């Protein structure tokens, strides 16, 4: 479950929120979209890179289909069809037009190939100028595992952290990966920024998550949030 206490921007219309990282990013994206749609808001979901295609009835291709979904109290997902059951970014002018009509916009801004954590490639993330908030997501399932087993863009991650591929991911290293301006905070600038530690679904992961939150706050002055989702809620 998520709410305004964890993410204050969910209480206000007008935000454009970009999500980066791995370990539940798409699940969180749709959870936030659903939360806002349930309040009667016009919510738009899209991507600046790629996103898994949702159920067909949520995928809108025209103004009329977007308005119909909003009238039914649902969020609308927009994007151009891509291989492997994905959507890619819609034409820039179309996306800007649809964003201008929405009360809240949620954008997936990079990919992680289903790894629980990642470092960005040179061209990542793709943050729109309109985006005012960025969430860097990582899955707590990565902690305690060698980077080479749990981290997408392994070479970049090792360079950023200064460790070999065999190094186990610790709360300190995960906090560094999320808080770094070459990692989770890349290109964030003056935007609001949150580190999201997902998969906090066991006592051990919750403990490690809290340790990571402490490092984020004390060493990097970064706000962090623990989240977890039931199996039925996951994208």
Regions found by a protein language model. Give the residues of each.
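Phosphate-binding/switch loop-helix module in NTP-utilizing enzymes
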Residues: 82-119, 124
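Walker A (P-loop) phosphate-binding motif
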Residues: 2-39
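G-domain G4 guanine-recognition motif of GTPases
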Residues: 109, 139-140, 160-167, 177-180, ...
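Canonical P-loop GTPase G-domain recognition
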Residues: 209, 213-235
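N-terminal phosphate/diphosphate-binding loop that engages ATP/GTP or pyrophosphate donors
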Residues: 33-85
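Inter-motif core of Ras-like GTPase G domains
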Residues: 121-143
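A short, acidic, amphipathic alpha-helical segment used as a generic capping/interface helix at domain edges
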Residues: 166-187, 211
């Amino acid at each position: 479950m998520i709410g305004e206490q964890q993410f204050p921007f969910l209480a206000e219309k007008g935000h454009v929120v970009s999500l980066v990282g791995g370990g539940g990013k798409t699940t969180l994206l749709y959870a936030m979209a659903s939360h806002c749609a349930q309040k009667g808001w016009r919510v738009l979901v899209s991507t600046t890179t790629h996103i898994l295609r949702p159920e067909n009835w949520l995928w809108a291709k025209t103004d009329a289909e977007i308005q119909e979904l909003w009238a039914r109290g649902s969020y609308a997902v927009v994007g151009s069809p891509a291989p492997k059951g994905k959507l890619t970014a819609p034409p820039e002018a179309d996306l800007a037009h649809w964003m201008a009509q929405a009360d809240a916009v949620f954008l997936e801004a990079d990919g992680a190939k289903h790894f629980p954590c990642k470092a960005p490639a040179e061209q990542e993330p793709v943050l729109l100028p309109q985006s005012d908030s960025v969430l860097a997501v990582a899955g707590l399932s990565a902690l305690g595992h060698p980077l080479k087993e749990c981290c997408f863009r392994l070479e970049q991650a090792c360079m950023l952290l200064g460790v070999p591929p065999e190094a186990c991911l610790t709360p300190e290293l995960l906090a560094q990966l999320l808080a770094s301006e070459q990692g989770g905070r890349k290109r964030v600038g003056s935007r609001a920024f949150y580190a999201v530690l997902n998969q906090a679904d066991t006592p051990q992961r919750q403990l490690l998550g809290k340790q990571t939150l402490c490092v984020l706050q004390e060493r990097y002055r970064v706000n962090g949030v623990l989240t977890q989702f039931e199996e039925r809620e996951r994208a």
